[in-house]
A protein has these predicted regions:
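Active-site beta-strand->loop->alpha-helix modules in alpha/beta enzyme cores, enriched
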Residues: 2-178, 182-192, 235-236, 264-274, ...
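A conserved mid-domain beta-alpha-beta active-site/ligand-binding segment of alpha/beta enzyme cores
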Residues: 211-271
């Protein structure tokens, strides 16, 4: 069976930008390895769930769900730190991966498997110390991501490797894209054909474009200018006749892992608290003019 590696810069990126591709591979019997590059520690959402920052009240950022100030004492959980947010986000990713693994197989009895790896890169690894997610990616950030990816490529040479585009405006996403791009370019230009399985694994590497950058022609569509010139930019369309089934599975099963609110079980809906509009745009109700899809390039 094919072995597929998905390098997710933070927990939720695998669902928001690569989820349909993951479902396709699982439903067709592939072994899918999710590599969470970092825990996604974040003080901002910790402040939201704590209801306070520097002594000032913080109103929840998802008013459609609950337009109030959170209170750990009232709602029954220990106040959060950036570290506990990271732990909770990893749990969300594992829950989402488990829901993906339950997708009905295309061929009865031919089931894909899931494995979750946590690379443990520090928060803001793409540009350490920058203080801004959109700061330019640094050589150190690319090197950190490259070391993680190369470890899996070396261990599993006969495999497929996917991550986010180097054109993404978030430096952690871009670090993963540049890292895999450098490995791919080296494989194409430097690796001898005697190492055919290693070479083929990286030659087939692909890069997914964040939903934020799909609307290249919309007046309000901000996107890195080089996205439109990426080689091989196309919709991931291997799912064919199963498209609607995968969409329904994502909408009705998988994204609940990032929306569920159950503090007693360690579920805090962190994905939705952080980027509610991304979840809304990626997974609209059935019949919406917007489609669930993944956009990638070579």
């Amino acid at each position: 069976m094919a072995r597929v590696f998905i390098y997710s810069p933070h927990p939720d990126d695998e669902v928001l930008s690569m989820g349909l591709a993951m479902l396709h591979y699982l439903a067709n019997g592939s072994d899918v390895h999710l590599v969470s590059m970092s825990n996604g520690e974040a003080q901002g959402v910790a402040n939201t769930l704590n209801g306070t920052a520097n002594g000032n009240p913080v109103v929840c950022s998802t008013p459609a769900d609950h337009p109030y100030i959170h209170s750990p004492a009232r709602e029954g959980y220990t106040p959060h730190t950036a570290a506990t947010i990271g732990d909770a986000r990893i749990k969300e990713a594992r829950a989402a991966l488990g829901a993906m693994a339950m997708v009905p197989p295309v061929t009865p009895g031919v089931l894909g498997t899931v494995t979750h790896h946590v690379a443990g890169l520090p928060a803001e690894y793409g540009a350490p110390g920058s203080g801004s997610s959109t700061a330019p990616v640094t050589p150190e950030g690319i090197a950190a991501a490259k070391a993680v990816i190369k470890g899996f490529v070396d261990e599993y040479p006969n495999s497929f490797h996917y991550t986010m585009s180097q054109s993404d405006d978030h430096h952690d996403h871009a670090a993963c894209g540049f890292a895999l791009r450098e490995l791919k370019d080296d494989a194409v230009n430097k690796v001898p054909w005697a190492d055919i399985t290693y070479k083929q694994a990286l030659v087939n590497a692909r890069f997914f474009v964040s939903r934020l950058y799909w609307a290249l022609s919309q007046p309000d569509g901000q996107y890195p200018p080089d996205v439109a010139s990426m080689p091989g930019l196309s919709w991931f369309n291997y799912y064919g006749a199963n498209y609607d089934r995968y969409c329904d599975w994502m909408r009705n099963q998988v994204i609940d892992a990032y929306r569920a609110w159950n503090p007693a079980a360690g579920a805090y809906g962190i994905g939705y608290h952080q980027v509610p509009t991304q979840f809304t745009r990626c997974f609209p109700p059935a019949g919406s003019a917007e489609k669930i899809a993944n956009l990638w390039h070579a």
